[in-house]
């Protein structure tokens, strides 16, 4: 018995090549068309020429701060569940899938943070165009000497949401029919966190796209590593159910 999605050439095309090509084209289109500034201009204008939602309860406290704590708590819950599964025989089929989920989420967040540590880009609220003090400097542009470094690309908070794209593969091993719900959950969390941060002036849309691309890449790569163990877990689950039926 296999886990879903199945591997092979079709998987490489549908889960690796096409998604990453889509992310790359979207990021290039945003850069060439000025889509980041176009969207940020309108969000800024709708708030009266300021980032009025920067410190609002919903965007700052509820979604940004509480959302971060909720994500950490959920990840800790996955780790605790994995520890319990290691001690309880009836939970044995969940060991590999839970380990995958914990590792994939953590690696996604860490990879986003790592790229953010050297990318050196500013937040919209830092730019003179939106009431800040710094000029816009693109990702591949030479940053002027003396200009304070930026730390806003890719989007860390949105990455905390998109990290849960790995639910697609976790549920593919545990409840294959639910895997699309897992994918939808990861996309929904990433969009929720990302849009809230854009409304605050903390990120451009391309920052969120980059985070989604990183998290999906990590989820796929980690799945390839854990897939053999997840297949064994699926077979163990099927054997356990068969023994229970015979009993």
Please annotate each region the language model reported.
Residues 25, 29, 36, 75-83, ...:
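Alpha-helical membrane-inserting segments
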Residues 19-24, 73, 101-109, 212, ...:
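Alpha-helical transmembrane spans of integral membrane proteins, capturing the lipid-embedded, hydrophobic core
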Residues 11-19, 137-247:
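Membrane-embedded catalytic cores of phosphoryl/pyrophosphoryl-handling enzymes
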Residues 2-5, 79-90, 169-175, 221-227:
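Structural signal for the C-terminal ends of transmembrane alpha-helices
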Residues 91-174:
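Membrane-interface loops
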